[in-house]
């Protein structure tokens, strides 16, 4: 059965979207990288998309051979990883915490293959764990939300109800309450299984429920499900002044352009940079396993500011948030890490 799965995965690897000819994957002179996305897919305009941006940049700038797999369901992840490892790829990347236990199993069987897991942790020497201080970036967007709300009520829509997503929610609430201790923050989660990342209908339903309670700024950390919150704030419409009455805060990648005028900002995780850097390390033969942490100090997390949202945020708010960012970096502000509880 395993042989059959490996064969099927190998076919998926061969047919995956990538550039280059058929024989490039067998070119021993070039670094070969395989990436396995989570079930949200690389076009989720969020977490997976950020990882894809990183490997595509590596393909352009470093001349690697890139293959990717978008598993239709979680059972396809392990065979895909094994297919890359069996072919002797120089680096196998897994996207998302849910892949960490799977990679732990596969990486043990291929100790001479380099692996990297985004948002997961492994103690194996051939696995690089790429993790982020999401709570720090979430604190900053919480401050922006608190300075923007007219109702004193905020919302948070998470994907899967897990400690990682509580890290976003807790940082967001602490940042908001640093501005206004009396502010209300409603929290809801799409679900408790992997499907929670790919249910925009449920995401919209939760966001509309929070809007019904008075929330006028909603932060979403829910993968593809979060796009439903974008639809919800757009549905709420604009006021007489032509300004949106409700805003959403995007996550992972810059989502400001998804619904221009309705996206207050995005809490960006520079997954693209982390993935690019680990590919570059492999190319330059300096790969190191272990935990690689990306926080505000390394620009691993940030909030996005561009032509789409700059008119929505007062310069005085940006100054206040920048001051807080510096204090977090210096350790003068300690943001609670929900995963460390």
Regions found by a protein language model. Name each.
Residues 6-12:
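Core hydrophobic alpha-helical transmembrane segments of single-pass membrane proteins
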Residues 22-341:
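A residue-level marker of the well-folded mature domains of exported/periplasmic proteins
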Residues 13-17:
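C-terminal motif of bacterial Sec signal peptides marking the signal peptidase cleavage site
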Residues 1-5:
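Bacterial N-terminal signal peptides that target proteins for export
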């Amino acid at each position: 059965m395993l042989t059959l799965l490996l064969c099927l995965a190998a076919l998926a690897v061969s047919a995956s979207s990538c550039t280059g000819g058929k024989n490039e994957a067998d070119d021993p002179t070039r670094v070969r990288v395989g990436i396995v996305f989570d079930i949200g897919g690389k076009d989720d305009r969020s977490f997976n998309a950020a990882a894809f941006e990183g490997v595509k940049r590596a393909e352009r700038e470093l001349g690697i051979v890139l293959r990717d797999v978008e598993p239709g369901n979680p059972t396809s992840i392990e065979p895909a990883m094994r297919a890359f490892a069996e072919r002797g790829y120089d680096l196998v990347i897994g996207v998302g915490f849910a892949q960490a236990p799977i990679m732990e199993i596969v990486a043990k069987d291929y100790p001479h293959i380099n692996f990297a897991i985004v948002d997961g942790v492994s103690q194996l020497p051939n696995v690089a764990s790429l993790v982020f201080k999401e709570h720090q970036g979430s604190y900053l967007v919480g401050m922006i939300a608190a300075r923007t709300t007219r109702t004193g009520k905020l919302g948070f829509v998470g994907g899967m109800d897990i400690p990682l997503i509580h890290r976003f929610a807790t940082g967001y609430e602490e940042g908001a309450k640093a501005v206004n201790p009396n502010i209300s923050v409603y929290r809801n989660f799409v679900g408790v299984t992997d499907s929670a990342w790919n249910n925009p209908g449920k995401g919209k339903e939760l966001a509309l429920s929070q809007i019904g309670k008075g929330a006028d700024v909603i932060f979403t950390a829910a993968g593809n499900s979060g796009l439903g919150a974008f639809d919800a704030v757009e549905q709420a419409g604009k006021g007489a002044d032509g300004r949106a009455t409700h805003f959403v805060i995007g996550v992972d990648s810059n989502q400001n352009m998804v619904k221009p005028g309705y996206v207050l900002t995005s809490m960006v995780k520079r997954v693209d940079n982390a993935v690019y850097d680990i590919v570059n390390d492999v190319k330059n033969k300096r790969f190191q396993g272990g935990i690689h942490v990306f926080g505000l100090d390394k620009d691993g997390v940030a909030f996005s500011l561009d032509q789409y949202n700059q008119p929505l945020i007062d310069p005085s708010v940006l100054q206040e948030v920048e001051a807080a960012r510096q204090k977090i970096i210096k350790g003068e502000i300690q943001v609670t890490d929900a995963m460390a509880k």
